[in-house]
């Protein structure tokens, strides 16, 4: 069985922990408590293959920055999250999060995830955003950002309704597998070049 380390990053309070709890245990906590560090594990079948996903939940707050970075080594794929109803969490993907990941794990694949999908049509949320002259993040905006940061894919999901929730983690596996295939091809290519340059005495 293949093991994959999935590290979940993004601003605090955008639903990262709820997403993981909903996926691993079908439960959601209504109380927000900042995560310092949490680890979940789950087994799943994808494309007729068994996988063991090690899910690392991290704190998004700046004060936990050093601690958060300790979770990064040996990560196979990042789920880089923002809230679809929090425009600042969206803009911070490009302003700070991509830079942090590139500094620490420049070659690790990323799946961009928009959380709290169910709240995009919530009238209270829409009124609150309207007061600030803001709108929820559109699917097209997510796709465009995904391309800009060279992410493997973009997925919108809801921890509450579980819409697209399983797709998030399937995409994480796909990203990891695609990256490893690419690395393997590159290695074979380099080996061929090395053999061509070798002179037998």
From Swiss-Prot:
Gene Ontology annotations for the cellular component aspect, listed alphabetically: cell projection; cytoplasm; cytoplasmic vesicle; cytoskeleton; early phagosome membrane; filopodium; phagocytic cup lip; plasma membrane
Disulfide bonds: none
Alphabetized SMART domains for the sequence: RAB, RAN, RAS, RHO
Keyword annotations of the record: Cell membrane, GTP-binding, Lipoprotein, Membrane, Methylation, Nucleotide-binding, Prenylation
Protein residues bound to GTP: 10-17, 57-61, 115-118
Keyword Nucleotidyltransferase found: no
GO terms (BP aspect): actin filament organization; actin filament polymerization; cell motility; cortical cytoskeleton organization; establishment or maintenance of cell polarity; mitotic cytokinesis; phagocytosis; Rac protein signal transduction
Topology in the lipid bilayer: Lipid-anchor
Keyword field contains Amino-acid biosynthesis: no
Residue span(s) of the pro-peptide: 199-201
Localization in the cell: Cell membrane
InterPro entries: P-loop_NTPase, Small_GTP-bd, Small_GTPase, Small_GTPase_Rho
A GO term for molecular function: GTP binding
Covalently attached lipid (S-geranylgeranyl cysteine), positions: 198
Record Pfam families: Ras (PF00071)
Sites bearing Cysteine methyl ester, chain numbering: 198
CDD domains reported for this sequence: Rho
Major subcellular location class: membrane
Motif (Effector region): 32-40
Family listed: Belongs to the small GTPase superfamily. Rho family.
Name this protein carries in UniProt: Rho-related protein racG
Organism: Dictyostelium discoideum
Lineage, uppermost ranks: Eukaryota, Amoebozoa, Evosea, Eumycetozoa, Dictyostelia
Designated gene of the protein: racG
């Amino acid at each position: 069985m293949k093991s994959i380390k999935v590290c979940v990053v993004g601003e605090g309070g955008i639903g990262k922990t709820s997403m993981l709890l909903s996926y691993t245990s079908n439960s959601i906590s209504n109380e927000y408590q900042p995560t310092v560090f949490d680890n979940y594990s789950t087994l799943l079948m994808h494309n007729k293959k068994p996988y063991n996903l090690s899910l690392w939940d991290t704190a998004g707050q700046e004060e936990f920055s050093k601690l958060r970075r300790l979770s990064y080594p040996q990560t196979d794929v990042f789920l880089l999250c923002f809230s679809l109803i929090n425009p600042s969490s969206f803009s911070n993907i490009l302003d700070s999060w991509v830079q942090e990941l590139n500094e620490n794990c420049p070659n690790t694949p990323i799946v961009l995830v928009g959380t709290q999908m169910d709240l995009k049509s919530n009238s209270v949320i829409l009124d609150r955003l309207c007061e600030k002259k803001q709108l929820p993040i559109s699917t097209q905006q997510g796709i465009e950002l995904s391309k800009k940061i060279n992410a493997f894919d973009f997925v919108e999901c809801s921890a509450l309704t579980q819409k697209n929730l399983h797709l998030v983690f399937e995409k994480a596996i796909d990203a990891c597998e695609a990256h490893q295939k690419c690395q393997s091809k590159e290695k074979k290519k380099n080996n061929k070049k090395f053999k061509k340059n070798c002179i037998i005495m």
